[in-house]
Amino acid sequence: MAETTVETPVEGTEGEETFAEVTTFESEVPVEGEYTSESLAGRFGDPQPAAGLGRRKNAIARVRIVPGTGKWKINGRTLEDYFPNKVHQQEVNEPFKVLELDGRYDVIARISGGGVSGQAGALRLGVARSLNEADVDNNRATLKKAGFLSRDDRAVERKKAGLKKARKAPQYSKR
């Protein structure tokens, strides 16, 4: 590693430029051409921690993945407690299944807003984005091909004045 010397001025001495002891420390950033097995540890093959944000309808999911055993914590609850419906559990797990990374990461998520389906969609997007961030070179193409990195921007259309719903008009009587 590269050694760097730093001189720091001593406080309280006015007018004089007095410097404290010279401190030498080793930089943690490897200098070009100085890569070792320790500096590359965790870059290839090992799971990396990452974070991602997902949105769907009115739901927002903030997701962190850390190397682990496949545990889920969503707003302090397990996946089965938060999403009792198996369809939603499968939807949220899809990015891991496509990348064949089941059980290699623990997921910690905070979800707010929207309903159950929107929250599941937001969580899936957040998980996919965090997996993409963890290893862009290996994961991005697979996740993109499966459509997991695209935000589904469909939302409820607003109700218009003079109509009963967004598009439903009141019954028309000719006579």
Curated annotation (Swiss-Prot):
Give the organism, scientific name. Streptomyces griseus subsp. griseus (strain JCM 4626 / CBS 651.72 / NBRC 13350 / KCC S-0626 / ISP 5235)
Q: What biological-process terms (Gene Ontology) are attached?
A: translation
Tell me yes or no: is Transmembrane among this UniProt entry's keywords: no
Keyword Ribonucleoprotein attached = yes
**What name is this protein filed under?**
Small ribosomal subunit protein uS9
Which InterPro entries does the record match to this protein? Ribosomal_Su5_D2-typ_SF, Ribosomal_uS9, Ribosomal_uS9_bac/plastid, Ribosomal_uS9_CS, Ribsml_uS5_D2-typ_fold_subgr
Q: Which UniProt keywords apply?
A: Ribonucleoprotein, Ribosomal protein
Its organism's taxonomic lineage begins at: Bacteria, Bacillati, Actinomycetota, Actinomycetes, Kitasatosporales
Task: Please state which protein family the record places this protein in.
Answer: Belongs to the universal ribosomal protein uS9 family.
Which SUPFAM superfamilies did the record assign? Ribosomal protein S5 domain 2-like
PANTHER family membership: RIBOSOMAL PROTEIN S9, SMALL RIBOSOMAL SUBUNIT PROTEIN US9M
User: Cellular component GO terms, alphabetically?
Assistant: cytoplasm; small ribosomal subunit
PROSITE patterns reported for this sequence: RIBOSOMAL_S9
Which one of the record's GO molecular function terms can you name? structural constituent of ribosome
Disulfide pattern = none
